[in-house]
Regions:
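Bacterial Sec-dependent N-terminal signal peptides
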Residues: 1-30
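Flexible, polar/acidic helix-loop-strand segments at domain edges
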Residues: 171, 175, 320-371
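Membrane-proximal, proline-rich intrinsically disordered regions
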Residues: 19-73, 255, 272-273, 459-461, ...
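Long, intrinsically disordered, low-complexity segments
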Residues: 18-20, 45, 59, 71, ...
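Short, solvent-exposed loop/beta-turn-alpha elements that line the ligand-binding surface or hinge
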Residues: 86-109, 129, 177-188, 306-311, ...
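Conserved, well-structured interaction surfaces
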Residues: 43-48, 52-56, 60-64, 88-162, ...
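Short, surface-exposed recognition loops and adjoining beta-strand edges that mediate ligand/DNA contacts
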Residues: 29, 33, 69-91, 165-177, ...
Length: 473
């Protein structure tokens, strides 16, 4: 009887989700890949081409909301970089740092990350179960490695946003009354502890079993590479646990392995954002868009329908951010912010309105990882290792490209000032790349920075911000 009741519940949930999908533009996905496994664990793939097709489906997650728009909401709007721009209740919760569990954007981000992780798990497990004599080992291992990279990315963002969270690493067979007790906990899992999630992420980014099978840096391809995996590993190591317990030597080592892959800074910062300059020497992981498959972030951030902006766009630069740029020297200022006229707004004067300028056309790619990010992450780790002069030399190399003198910052400024120098440079260099919120949380600086953040009239916006707001509901 107990199994019959449980089975009825599962069927009912399936019916509800199915019916709701016709009504809800953004339905919440299940955690698992239901029906992709069997009790005797046979692969659903007839050939490696089937695995590659589903792997491509996992890559398509990078063209979903979580990477086309919500990455800016998470990383920039939740920080002192941007105002949201939108007037909806859900949008305003981000702007005010007062997220609720009923916010549809929170549900959207949750469901899309779990869909990405679930598809990657399906690829991993079904490819493992294939008859090894039916595939070329090198290609089979590469497919599994790329799927592990994608799963690691999804769970890294999940654990950074929610902390303890469900983690599903198994396939789900067809559910019957006989096997329901066995699979019910997998279908509806308890939250895994943060440390356990990080263990899994680092296992998926293991050098021996994953990274070795990925391709090396390959210009012009939207694909997981060794450099991208080392970069993700560096970010994970720089984030896990408390600052006092992190192994910053390993962060530096991971960053150095990225650098060893042969990436180089482009000489002109603006080239990174020119739509016809895709996959530069600096790009580590970049999502590709064309006129046939456009980047719709352009429509909400910048697009001008008739030669003038007639409604305020999303992710409006804040007064605090604009004030930090050296407008005379810093070439990144004009490359990152475009000033236009907007008929009405609450943040800026109508005749002088800043727009985020890194997504310039519908064919603009989205750069999710690039060398400057990793160099500055290495600098952050070096400061924590009390090697501040080395860190500031890296910061100065980034600043030199932006138009400053080669030694514009004093290498002997000391650790405390060095921390702030790296933090400030990451903010200006990586504005509108979804990094600022995570930088502040990672370095225990969110509350201090946001409690000093002001609106256009100089009023404090978040004077009473509480620590629990560093995780999502």
């Amino acid at each position: 009887m107990k199994n019959i009741i449980k089975l009825a519940y599962v069927v009912l949930c399936t019916l509800v989700v199915s019916c709701s999908s016709f009504l809800d533009e953004k339905p919440q996905s299940d955690f698992m890949q239901e029906g992709t496994g069997t009790e005797d664990q046979e692969s659903k793939y007839g050939s490696l081409a089937d695995a590659q097709a589903e792997l491509q489906g996992a890559y398509e997650s990078f063209k979903a909301d979580i990477f086309q728009s919500e990455n800016y909401t998470i990383g920039d709007v939740q920080s002192d970089n941007c105002y949201i721009g939108g007037d909806g209740v859900a949008e305003q919760e981000f702007d005010l740092l007062k997220l609720t569990s009923t916010n549809y954007k929170v549900e959207l981000v949750w469901s899309q990350y779990y869909s990405m992780a679930g598809t990657a798990t399906s690829v991993i497990e079904n490819t493992k179960m294939m008859d090894p004599t039916s595939t070329v080992a090198e290609e089979r291992n590469r497919v599994i490695a790329e799927a592990k990279f994608l799963r690691a990315w999804a769970y890294f963002d999940i654990v950074r946003l929610w902390g303890d969270a469900p983690m599903v690493l198994d396939l789900i067979p067809t559910i019957t009354a006989e096997n329901l007790d066995k699979w019910y906990p997998v279908m509806y899992p308890e939250r895994s502890a943060t440390d356990k999630i990080y263990d899994q992420i680092l296992d998926d980014l293991n050098e021996e079993n994953t990274i070795r099978y990925l391709v090396s840096k390959n210009k012009g391809i939207f694909q997981a590479t060794k450099g991208a995996a080392y970069a993700l590993r560096a970010k994970v190591l720089a984030t896990r646990g408390e600052k006092s317990t992190r192994d910053y030597t390993k962060v530096v080592e991971a960053c150095d392995k990225v650098i060893a892959e042969g990436y180089t800074l482009v000489s002109n910062f603006d080239e990174l954002w020119q739509p016809d300059k895709k996959f530069s020497s600096e790009s580590i992981f970049e999502v590709y868009y064309t006129s046939d498959a456009p980047n719709w972030a352009y429509w909400v951030l910048l697009k001008e329908d008739d030669g003038s902006v007639t409604w305020r766009r999303y992710c409006t630069p804040t007064h605090d951010l604009v004030a930090k740029f050296d407008k005379e020297k810093d070439t990144r200022y004009a490359s990152s912010i475009l000033w236009k006229s907007v008929p009405y707004d609450t943040y800026w004067p109508a005749d002088s309105y800043p727009l985020s300028y890194k997504i310039r056309e519908k064919t603009s790619n989205i750069i999710l990882m690039r060398l400057a990010d990793i160099l500055l992450l290495k600098a952050e780790a070096l400061v924590e290792l009390d090697r501040t002069p080395e860190a500031i030399r890296i910061v100065n190399s980034i600043r030199e490209r932006a138009g400053f003198a080669p030694s514009s910052l004093d290498e002997n400024m000391g650790q405390a000032r060095g921390r702030l120098a790296v933090e400030n440079e990451r903010q200006l260099e990586l504005y509108m790349e979804g990094q600022r919120w995570f930088d502040l949380v990672r370095n225990n600086r969110l509350l201090e920075v946001m409690q000093k953040h002001k609106d256009k009239d100089g009023r404090l916006l978040f004077a009473g911000l509480q620590a629990f707001r560093q995780l999502w509901p």
